[in-house]
């Protein structure tokens, strides 16, 4: 049976949309495979790592009929990448193997039985569905994902908190040193739901989501259950397990009523920090900010007695403050805000700083100071 027959670019795009979660080496060899299910003209591809399952349906030609098998996903992609985009390729079943043909090339691949592929059991208790433009969710993820912890023993920090309540969707991430919050308005009102999405899920969603805008921009539908989240978009169904545990009360972490605030251009501040970061210690990455009426001075030095000083003119008439930060934490936030102006609020040299967008509550970033 000819399972599919289409140009290389079409086949590769469909395979790549589901293959991001596939590991080359796994304790279960079949998890390195993609589950192929042909029903009539429709071809369904499914991958899983036991935590996440991605499924997409496409029409890629071939014979009409019913057929199921599994084959190595990465190997198939590696072969397809070596072929021209406009070349017609076909995948044929021959006994227990699959044969990939393209031009004068022929590849015989081993398959494993479809019935051995471990499908994720979907929850029967998903909450009400709601949707946002894919670009909106991609932007929100970009504004907070850099603050996720990496392999923290506090496992609930290794991901992003999603909070849907009323007509607001909020995303929060923290690694204990900094906290990023971003929110967007929903078209419908939803009951309060809170879930923590794992780090791998977040990274995969960012890869797959479209950033196309405009009137007909594609949407993503979301549903949450106690132990799962489901996302439906672009012909794909994305089901993921959740991180168990209690996320910190982010409202208590976000400081209020700072005595001093500066509003300045995001790009000049980012450029100043990137310049002074060159002279920081590889280990500590610390910069000092000296803030006084009219001037913001950014300084750094390292163990080789080298130093950098950069000054910015600011509209400021508050207290004189000297405070240290991990420069990477500041750069991460400024690089992902996507706005022209930034507001920095401070109380003194020993308290956390709050970065926001002027006259906009949709983004908040809290960063702890650092002794230098």
Go through each PLM region and give its residues.
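Structural preference for solvent-exposed beta-strand-turn elements
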Residues: 1-372
């Amino acid at each position: 049976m000819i399972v599919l027959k289409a140009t290389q670019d079409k086949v590769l795009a469909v395979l790549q949309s589901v293959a991001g979660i596939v590991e080359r080496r796994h304790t279960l060899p079949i998890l390195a495979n993609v589950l192929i299910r042909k029903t009539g003209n429709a071809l369904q591809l499914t991958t899983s790592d036991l935590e996440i399952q991605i499924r997409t349906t496409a029409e890629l030609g071939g014979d009409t009929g019913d057929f199921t098998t599994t084959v190595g996903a990465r190997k198939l992609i590696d072969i397809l990448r070596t072929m021209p985009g406009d070349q017609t390729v076909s995948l044929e079943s021959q006994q227990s193997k699959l044969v990939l043909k393209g031009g004068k090339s022929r590849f015989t691949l081993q398959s494993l039985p479809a019935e051995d592929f471990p499908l994720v059991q979907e929850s029967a208790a998903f909450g009400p569905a709601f949707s946002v433009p894919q670009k909106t969710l991609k932007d929100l993820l970009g504004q907070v994902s850099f603050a996720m912890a990496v392999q923290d023993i506090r496992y609930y920090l290794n991901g992003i908190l999603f909070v849907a309540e009323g007509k607001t969707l909020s995303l929060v991430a923290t690694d204990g040193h900094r906290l990023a919050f971003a929110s967007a308005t929903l078209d419908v009102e939803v009951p309060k739901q809170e879930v923590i999405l794992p780090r791998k899920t977040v990274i995969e969603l960012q890869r797959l989501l479209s950033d196309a805008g405009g009137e007909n921009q594609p949407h993503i539908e979301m549903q949450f259950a106690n132990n799962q989240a489901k996302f439906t978009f672009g012909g794909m169904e994305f089901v993921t397990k959740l991180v168990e545990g209690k996320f910190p009360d982010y409202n208590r972490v976000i400081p209020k009523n700072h005595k001093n605030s500066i509003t300045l251009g995001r790009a000049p501040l980012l450029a100043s920090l990137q310049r002074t970061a060159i002279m920081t210690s590889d280990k500590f990455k610390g910069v000092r900010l000296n803030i006084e009426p009219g001037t913001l001075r950014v300084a750094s030095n390292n163990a080789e007695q080298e130093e950098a000083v950069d000054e910015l003119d600011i509209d400021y008439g508050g207290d004189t403050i000297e405070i240290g930060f991990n420069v990477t934490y500041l750069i991460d936030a400024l690089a992902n805000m996507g706005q022209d102006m930034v507001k920095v609020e401070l109380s003194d040299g020993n308290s956390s700083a709050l970065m926001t967008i002027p006259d906009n509550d949709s983004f908040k970033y809290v960063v702890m100071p650092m002794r230098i």
